[in-house]
């Protein structure tokens, strides 16, 4: 019998040079050999970049803004996470995906190098949502306080150092966003920014609809924007992850959906931390055309 202590708060495991959550890494062979379908739609992000938000938007776009249809099940069932595997506790992402009808929505945080080859071979459409690194670091820290599948984050100062060096689950934010940005030159990838979606959700939802070849009128777009607002989603038990056991996600430590704003990093970074981060950021992001806004 598997006990939670066998997989909770374990150190990350290296998979092909990338640090991956312990229980996910133990299921690696199944992930690597995953069989995609040509009409699969992949929703990819670095953790804490608005994954659940964009997942619910995509589901609503595909269902023409039908709120009742979108209430059919939990987000973890509608948009399974490819690499999710928690032994004895819940259906794995792959098991859920095998049950889901086409077109399937597939969530992942995997870096380009670890994504199953099948997705490239089938030329699957992909949506990548990127968020500025400073807000990601703060959000990821709070997430790791409550997500017991991750190693304990320790103090914020130490966590930020690990984040800057890529010593967190899924590795370096810098490498993640840069590699997905580059890949869009040769593959159908819609690359979106969290800050743009916050600033002008209608424009960004229209981009998603066009990418998925859906023609939605203003009324439907407005309904989608209302239903997927941070306030609505934070209180929606189908998407706010309160349905997961508290042994896995302890909402008393921090809520899954915490603030959902751009610029919260300013409440956490010291002047010295910010200066050091900026130096590393400039070095890591030199040579890329990627541009991020740290506030809007």
Curated annotation (Swiss-Prot):
Keywords: Cytoplasm, Transferase. The keyword Transferase applies. GO terms for molecular function: aryl sulfotransferase activity. Expressed highly in the colon, kidney and small intestine of male and female dogs. Highly expressed in the jejunum and ileum of the male dog than the female dog, which displayed more expression in duodenum (at protein level). Its EC number is 2.8.2.1. Substrate binds at residues 107-109. Contrary to other mammalian orthologs the canine SULT1B1 does not shown sulfotransferase activity toward dopamine. This is Sulfotransferase 1B1. It comes from Canis lupus familiaris (Dog). The lineage of its organism: Eukaryota, Metazoa, Chordata, Craniata, Vertebrata. The gene is SULT1B1.
